[in-house]
Amino acid sequence: MTKAVYWFDEPEDHNYPAGVEYLSLLVTPEVAKALTQRLRDAPISHFKAKDIFRASGLPLAGISNEQVEKTLHKIECEKKLSPLLLVRHMNSLVIADGYHRMCAVYQHDQDAKIPCKIV
């Protein structure tokens, strides 16, 4: 049986500035800040890891990635993870914060439901 993945009820405070930094590579800093404020206000939704992965169109970071390895260790130690921050953009999904968490959870159990804030 696959070990459960534990989650915080809400993203941690440091996830939002990280989201702004990443989104600022794709849109203007003003738009990135506005999107991040909308993410703060958004309710938590749940999506399967495999669906987030497919919608993002991103390659999967492997076990050799240090951040993925650290997150897999947290899962094994039953430590809580922070929900993802997602932005719908055109016909794709942008992972504003939580890419390595998504990759780790996908490798652990691709059918696991991941809590997310999505706008």
Task: Locate predicted features.
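A short, basic-hydrophobic beta/loop patch
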Residues: 2-9, 81-119
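Short amphipathic alpha-helical surface micro-motifs
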Residues: 27-28, 65-68, 96-100
